[in-house]
Amino acid sequence: MRVRKRKGAEEHLENHPEYVIMNPEDIKGHWKEVFGNDHPIHIEVGSGKGGFITGKALQNPEINYIGIDIQLSVLSYALDKVLESNAPNVKLLRVDGSSLTNYFENGEIDLLYLNFSDPWPKTKHEKRRLTYKDFLETYKQILPEHGEIHFKTDNRGLFEYSLASFSQFGMTLKQVWLDLHASDFEGNVMTEYEEKFSKKGQVIYRVEAFF
């Protein structure tokens, strides 16, 4: 999700250390201590403006959530959502999805979400797609054995690519939705993009896959 540069975004993040972890490399292996409990930890890579991660945190207080985004301004908007919700089970990180092993120990994360990732449609940009094999290798390291990825998108091309990428990597497709909003799936938390696209009548695709 690309947004205009937000004035004061960095200062805004720095002023809320209770939610924004500025030195995540120092916490590797100790995330349960940060949350102060032994609850499962779920992360969203590319958390955008925080609608999904905040909604999930409110929906599931027994689960800890970490929203990850590399864009400073975007993360500052996510912080607004977290502050508004007052959810105690959310943390935010400004890091790149390719470097997650620098911040999380093997098996430290219980589940990983990818929502409306940039499709990078050009073949020469394949390695930038968050479901490319190199990213999957990174995710596999921080997830437990048979750890799951839950992926949503409105982009059919990226969805088909991701299904193939998961399968070629040796993952198992647990369940696939070719029209999520027309299904009987319960508990769906929509992202900002999802709300926008669904109002236009666009189909939303979803898959749950595990290693």
Curated annotation (Swiss-Prot):
Indicate the enzyme's highest-level EC class. transferase
Q: Reaction(s) catalyzed by this protein?
A: guanosine(46) in tRNA + S-adenosyl-L-methionine = N(7)-methylguanosine(46) in tRNA + S-adenosyl-L-homocysteine
Which residues are catalytic?
A: D118
Where do the segments described as Interaction with RNA lie? 124-129
- Per the UniProt entry, the Enzyme Commission number(s) are 2.1.1.33
Give a yes or no for keyword Acetylation in this entry.
Answer: no
Q: Which residues bind substrate?
A: K122, D154, T191, E192, Y193, E194
Please give the NCBIfam families that the UniProt record associates with this protein. PRK00121.2-2, tRNA (guanosine(46)-N7)-methyltransferase TrmB
Report the function annotation for this chain.
Catalyzes the formation of N(7)-methylguanine at position 46 (m7G46) in tRNA.
Put simply, this protein is called: tRNA (guanine-N(7)-)-methyltransferase
Q: Which organism is it from?
A: Streptococcus uberis (strain ATCC BAA-854 / 0140J)
Q: Upper taxonomic classification of the species?
A: Bacteria, Bacillati, Bacillota, Bacilli, Lactobacillales
